[in-house]
């Protein structure tokens, strides 16, 4: 969140924008950034967008799940789905404070029965595969159109 906040102007070009989709947070968790620091950064990002693009809808996606299987430990590192869900709850609460922000819960659409990122949907336990992105895009369709 900190890096996006620092470089937000580089990602937004000043033209008319209908919707902005934010999918951020997993790198903060991987770097052990405190949730309050990430929330402060996220709120600053939302406020900056709301100030510069007052008619733009902001879609805040839930942080995606990881697969905590042993074969993925090196990539997933310290991320856990329990921590991700805690952050997602905090994201949802933050989003509810802003009329222009809608929280988009996509976490469950990517998990298996054990609550892990489905192996078919990941390349390394953290990043999505083509199949994972297809499921994500299907989950987003109702929120974007």
Where are these regions (language model features)?
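Phosphate-binding glycine-rich loops and adjacent basic patches that engage nucleotide phosphates
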Residues: 1-11, 48-57, 96-105, 131
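Conserved SGNH/GDSL esterase-like catalytic core that processes O-acyl groups on lipids
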Residues: 1-47, 82-85
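Sec-exported extracytoplasmic/periplasmic mature domains
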Residues: 9, 13-16, 25, 43, ...
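Generic hydrophobic/packing signal
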Residues: 17, 39, 57-61, 128, ...
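Structural recognition of the beta-strand scaffold that forms the well-ordered cores
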Residues: 19-24, 28, 57-62, 102-105, ...
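Flexible domain-boundary/linker segments
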Residues: 37, 55, 59-62, 66, ...
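Catalytic His-Asp segment of secreted/periplasmic serine-dependent ester chemistry enzymes
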Residues: 66-145
């Amino acid at each position: 969140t900190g890096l996006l906040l620092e470089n937000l102007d580089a990602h937004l070009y000043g033209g008319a924008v209908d919707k902005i989709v934010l999918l951020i947070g997993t790198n903060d968790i991987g770097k052990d950034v405190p949730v309050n620091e990430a929330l402060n950064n996220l709120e600053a990002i939302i406020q900056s967008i709301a100030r510069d693009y007052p008619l733009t809808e902001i879609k805040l996606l839930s942080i995606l799940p990881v697969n905590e299987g042993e074969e993925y430990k090196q990539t997933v590192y310290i991320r856990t789905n329990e921590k991700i869900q805690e952050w997602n709850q905090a994201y949802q609460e933050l989003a509810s404070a802003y009329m222009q922000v809608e929280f988009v819960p996509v976490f469950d659409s990517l998990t298996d029965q054990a609550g892990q990122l489905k192996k078919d949907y990941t390349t390394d336990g953290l990043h999505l595969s083509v199949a994972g992105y297809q499921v994500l895009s299907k989950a987003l369709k109702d929120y974007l159109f």
